[in-house]
Amino acid sequence: MKSFISLLGLSFLTCHASAHYIFQSFTYKNIQYPPYGYIRVNDNYNSPVIDLASNDLRCNSGGETSKGTQTITVKAGDSFSFTGDIQVYHQGPLSIYMAKAPTTAAAFDGSGQVWFKILDIGPTFTNQVATWNLYQTYTYTIPPNLPNGDYLLRIQQLAIHNPYPGGIPQFYIECAQITVTNGGSGTPGPLVSIPGAFSDTDPGYTANIYSNFFNYTVPGPAVWASQGGSSAYTGISNGNNAATTLASMPAATGAATTATTIVTTTAAGSGSATKTGTSATATATGAVVQKFGQCGGQGWTGGTTCVAGSTCTATNAYYSQCL
């Protein structure tokens, strides 16, 4: 009997863990970069943040500092994507926030009344039945009116599948580091502090999606209303962007070693095409790769030896990661 209970508990924990997810990959100009290349590394695997007073609400546990994450240069008006390790599983809204860094994105911890929201994705109601947009990849646009500078770009999915107060809503969060160019002269807002932007009395936090659930307000500030252009989000339920090239990270410092890479990209409804280009290696061959860094995959010429305590694990034919 004891063995049966232990196995039952293990099964529950395995299912519970598998229902979690993490937005680990960033895409720009149809190039999807390796996990944590431009996204700050968290130290809680795929677990959510649940403490409304915690600084972890900004960029996840362990994401308060850069830890070597690179910063990608993007143009205002261009699209970008966050991709999770699996499809978002729990019902709840998704939001994207930004915060302008006083100096560099890498040096910014996200403190202060600096955060503004550029996107909310709540449920749609048809005949009083809610439908949630649960995707693996979410794509949106850098606001055309956004001033130039360094920013933290924060994705947040709030899981409310286990209603409060019996359950605690779960925040799934990651931050990318970006430098915006070709920007405008808008004034983003309203500005809020994180933590501080969410309360356990917010209707969108306390909502019971299983009882009398006919409308919904996403927690947090209003979305910045003067972003410019006519941006609309898109989502892919399972998998990466169409027409996406999987790429290695450019070298962070010093002269980069380049290699010719041939990759196959698939566009929706257009079959496949072959693209040839050069990509810089993330680490020199033989260098020790830090935890969560890339350590292998098709075309990879960087380091293949993981730091002590980590193992090089294949995610797919194109990407292996130190875990």
Swiss-Prot record:
Q: List the subcellular locations.
A: Secreted
Report residues binding Cu(2+): 20, 90, 172
**InterPro entries from the UniProt entry:** AA9, AA9_LPMO, CBD_sf, Cellulose-bd_dom_fun
- Which EC main class describes this enzyme? oxidoreductase
What's the family? Belongs to the polysaccharide monooxygenase AA9 family.
What's the name of the protein?
AA9 family lytic polysaccharide monooxygenase A
Q: Does the keyword Secreted apply?
A: yes
Q: Report which gene this protein is encoded by.
A: AA9A
